[in-house]
């Protein structure tokens, strides 16, 4: 689950991080009032969406008056912002953050942290190249990224934070300030089950003070059950409608941009199914794992989810019966096709537990369902059916 910038800053401020002052506004009048309240000659109006690249997309504007703040807010709020991290529809802007102007600054740094799957530990990343996408730095000048792995038994130690501060060229009081900042960030990361944390840029102001100008936080969704206060920050308007619906039925669904809907049991098999569709010249419209213990109801809902996507021109169902029985899946497919009134080609491949019985049920249903013998055959048939 992602947080908005204003939510991330409010959370990090509780752990002592020096964040840029800002006021949330949900309309033009509130934006104008926020400009007055900040009391500066300039302010920065930032669209609040769950996506990076806002500046290049016109979602971050410097304003010089309350009228200009109101105009920018009116332009952004109620619209969708399209960035390189969104799809063609973009993300809805429901509010803007009116922030104090902190520029010019002496330098822009980067500080971030993730859970490194290879070490299974929190790993901090820091760089002198702040203000740009860290992916660009990693690609062009990877030597400029410093990594620090934290031992979970002892936590982040002061000497580790000091080493990072020195590597970033910080001096005197800045070192102690950075140690407090990084230590607070680690506490926030662990106590709130972060999956991702970024301060970009971490500004060194003209007076030498550090300030978090932007903040990005992603929460591990599996931990939300024990984080009620954080879970309450969820903004469902920023999530894909079908993905949101899928979560209600414990379906693992990710929307893609192709035209072949996929329903598979098991994440590994789902990825293999998408791979072979691509290999045969098709484009998957989604990743959908109904799980090893799929029920009839979940399969019906999965079918509805797939067909709710107007770009879907055909559906490939690939089921390996282990825990789940293929005849039960077949019954669910038949019920779903009848209930949803499917008009696109549907190719079904069943293997494993009661596969023959399942295939017979599909054949005797009288519905226009195409059976496939093997994954290769299934992919070829669905790609041919949609004319990919």
Swiss-Prot record:
Return the EC number: 6.2.1.5
> How and how many cofactors are bound, per the record note?
Binds 1 Mg(2+) ion per subunit.
A Pfam family annotated for this UniProt entry:
Ligase_CoA
UniProt entry keywords in alphabetical sequence: ATP-binding, Ligase, Magnesium, Metal-binding, Nucleotide-binding, Tricarboxylic acid cycle
Annotated binding of substrate, by residue: 265, 322-324
Record-level GO BP terms: succinyl-CoA metabolic process; tricarboxylic acid cycle
Which reaction does this chain catalyze? succinate + ATP + CoA = succinyl-CoA + ADP + phosphate; GTP + succinate + CoA = succinyl-CoA + GDP + phosphate
- Span of domain ATP-grasp: 9-245
Cofactor(s) recorded in Swiss-Prot or TrEMBL: Mg(2+)
SUPFAM superfamilies the record matches? Glutathione synthetase ATP-binding domain-like (SSF56059), Succinyl-CoA synthetase domains (SSF52210)
Family listed: Belongs to the succinate/malate CoA ligase beta subunit family.
Q: What is this protein called?
A: Succinate--CoA ligase [ADP-forming] subunit beta
Organism of provenance? Laribacter hongkongensis (strain HLHK9)
Under the GO molecular function aspect, what terms does this record hold?
ATP binding; magnesium ion binding; succinate-CoA ligase (ADP-forming) activity; succinate-CoA ligase (GDP-forming) activity
Does this UniProt record's set of keywords contain ATP-binding?
A: yes
Positions of Mg(2+) binding: 200, 214
Its annotated function is as follows:
Succinyl-CoA synthetase functions in the citric acid cycle (TCA), coupling the hydrolysis of succinyl-CoA to the synthesis of either ATP or GTP and thus represents the only step of substrate-level phosphorylation in the TCA. The beta subunit provides nucleotide specificity of the enzyme and binds the substrate succinate, while the binding sites for coenzyme A and phosphate are found in the alpha subunit.
CC annotations in GO:
cytosol; succinate-CoA ligase complex
Gene3D superfamilies from the entry? ATP-grasp fold, A domain, ATP-grasp fold, B domain, Succinyl-CoA synthetase domains
Its ancestry begins with: Bacteria, Pseudomonadati, Pseudomonadota, Betaproteobacteria, Neisseriales
The record's listing under InterPro entries reads: ATP-grasp (IPR011761), ATP-grasp_succ-CoA_synth-type (IPR013650), ATP_grasp_subdomain_1 (IPR013815), Succ-CoA_synthase_bsu_CS (IPR017866), SUCC_ACL_C (IPR005811), Succ_CoA_ligase-like_bsu (IPR005809), Succinyl-CoA_synth-like (IPR016102)
- What pathway is this protein said to act in by its record? Carbohydrate metabolism; tricarboxylic acid cycle; succinate from succinyl-CoA (ligase route): step 1/1
Assembly and binders: Heterotetramer of two alpha and two beta subunits.
Query: Does the keyword Hydrolase feature in the UniProt annotation?
Result: no
Q: Where does ATP bind?
A: 46, 53-55, 100, 103, 108
